[in-house]
Amino acid sequence: MAPSYDQPYSVLLDRNIYDPDNLCEGIDLRRHHAADLEDVGAFRCQEDWRRLVGPLERPFRGGLGPQFSFITVAVPNCIPERMEITSYALEFGFIHDDVIDEHIEDADLSDMEEGLEQGAKTGSIDERGASGKRVIAAQIMREMMAIDPERAMVVAKSWAAGVQHSARREELTNFQTLDEYIPYRSLDVGYMLWHGLVTFGCAITIPPEEEALCTEFLTPALCAASLVNDLFSFEKEKNDANIQNAVYIVMKEHGCDEAEGRERLKARIRQEMAKFVQIVKDTKTRSDLSDDTKRYIDVMQYTLSGNVVWSAQCPRYNLKAEWNELQMLRAKHGVAKYPATFPPADGSMDHIWKKGSTQGESKGEKRKRQSVNGTNGVNGTNGVKKPTISRVGVDSLQLNEVVSLALSTDLPNLTTDVVLQPYAYITSMPSKGFRDQAVDSINNWLKTPAKATKKIKEIINMLHTASLMLDDLEDNSPLRRGKPSTHNVYGASQTINSATYQFTHATALAAGLSNPDCLRIFNEEINELYVGQSYDLYWTHNIICPTFGEYLRMVDMKTGGLFRMLTRLMTAESPLNGQISDSELNPLGCLIGRFFQIRDDYQNLVSAEYAQQKGFAEDLDEGKYSFTLIHCIRTLEANPSLAGEQMQLRALLMKRRVEGKLTNEAKREILDTMKKTQSLEYTLEVLRELHTKLDNEVGRLEKKFGDDNFALRLMMEMLKV
């Protein structure tokens, strides 16, 4: 039976009154009881911006509306105690977006990006010497962490991804058709921040393995939301010199006037809304999805109806709209003089306020509360854990007892706790989950059953993680994702044993897939992976610089092998198996593997995040022949005027071979040489070319399968450098 969700925080409205064009048929419209808390949060943010950053119109045309502010109707399921800080964060997003759009040179995106990435890793943002924007972001993190640390971290990660996208996106203007424009516009709709705010506000946790699937489900919703924004903002934007708006593009595409353009756009909005209404219905009845994912999709439908109603009356899009009386008083005198009116003094809403304060409790908070007094529900009492490993028995020196043990076949079992501990350690580190996203996005085409897809994800993640354990050991890497490498905690022997155990486990999973070809595919790609790694180690140990061709073949075998295994296993388990060969997706896997590896080579040398997570220019410590280093060496060899630099580089690489690492000063010398040979610029240019080829390959596959793949394109966009 499809679940029905409690709606204690809102009241149902007659959508037909507020949606005369019937844009969101089939979706209810609800209004939050704690609407006033949204206004308070928005005004607090505006006041802080003026105090910490600079001037701002009063009131600012952000999320506020005279009848309905945005969250009030777009997230009617928001837990009341989370409404104010959620609104504060959203208003900051509105203000910051306007700064980017109007004054890109003043946007301080790098500072914001760095701060949010710090928040995503640590749960706090350093404010010392920070910009006003970063101080505000730190305030948001503090308030959210005090309420729900687990989901506050999701907000920080999602927001950081959104800022990163804004900083790196390419401004495109020459769209000829609506279908060309929609993918670009949908990426720009602010979904990444909105995802974090909704999951925080409603206390939802999406399992990592279902995140990419959620993005796929939301494709028509993001399309509809972005087109609704364009529909209502066109009046404000239509005289802009560089207008980017769906109404304008429809007019240009069909050679029609504004009235017809609007009607055509409304028809497309209704079409996308209907798609999402069906997705909401289908999702509720699925047995292979978590309850939180189902609830998330259900909650997101109100974003669509709420967005329509808010857009129709908000001052952000309607320049003649007037603020309500309380909003004008708060804008003039501040929220300190006109504080929140919720919950009302008569106690009429106390029942939902109290319900909200416990319903939204995160798992971590619940465990913490339970451990204060009594059993903590894990493996101990009052927060004191029992040892993870217990001894088999008490040692005895009595001959008869020892002989009895030696002859017994009924000894206690040894658990897998010890062999799994190094693996559990590395998997506890933060991961971006690109491989899971790749599986889910590719499955948009292959329709591989959920049970098989889950197993394939496990196989790929086991192999990838085990490879990282061995790579770090073989390269003598001190850090992995900012923490000590596994072998530096558990030692080389236990690390090798634990990694090898994962390979055997993954083999068993591959053998358990329904298509017997899967084990053959698994073995073929594992062999490729080991051979590729052998060349990487051989070149490093013997200080042999490979050719570009040798390097790329090694990458195809080592890095591309896992992506190739992923696509081949999914194809083998797909109901389309008879219609497509297991090599159909090989070009995509090959390009992704090359792009990933060369991107990793580049980031290792230039990224501050990589330096924090792995150490400064760590590839040079390892003596690894990266794409950039190969270009540098080959350029030096071809240019006699750089003979001195060539000799110096060779001496430094030999020094690394003898001492096992390089000083930071030596690494900076090598980076200076790379600047002379323009090797970093060359690598970046190759990455951009590869990304273009990847985009073309995705387009080829979209035509072949007859289905656009928004999730895959979003993943590729996030990887762009």
Swiss-Prot record:
Region (Geranylfarnesyl diphosphate synthase): 326-721
Matching InterPro entries: Isoprenoid_synthase_dom_sf, Polyprenyl_synt, Polyprenyl_synt_CS
Binding residues for Mg(2+) 4: 471, 475
Protein residues bound to isopentenyl diphosphate: 432, 435, 464, 481
Keywords of the record: Isoprene biosynthesis, Lyase, Magnesium, Metal-binding, Multifunctional enzyme, Transferase
Metabolic or biological pathway, per its Swiss-Prot or TrEMBL entry: Secondary metabolite biosynthesis; terpenoid biosynthesis
Residue interval(s) of motif NSE/DTE: 229-237
EC number(s) on file: 4.2.3.145, 2.5.1.29, 2.5.1.81
Binding annotation for Mg(2+) 1: 97, 101
Placement of sequence motif DDXXD 1: 97-101
Function: Bifunctional sesterterpene synthase; part of the gene cluster that mediates the biosynthesis of the sesterterpenes ophiobolins, fungal phytotoxins with potential anti-cancer activities. The first step of the pathway is performed by the sesterterpene synthase oblA that possesses both prenyl transferase and terpene cyclase activity, converting isopentenyl diphosphate and dimethylallyl diphosphate into geranylfarnesyl diphosphate (GFPP) and further converting GFPP into ophiobolin F, respectively. Other sesterterpenoids (C(25) terpenoids) are found as minor products of oblA.
Domain notes: The conserved DDXXD motifs as well as the NSE/DTE motif are important for the catalytic activity, presumably through binding to Mg(2+).
Name of the protein in its database record: Ophiobolin F synthase oblA
Organism: Cochliobolus heterostrophus (strain C5 / ATCC 48332 / race O) (Southern corn leaf blight fungus)
Gene designation per UniProt: oblA
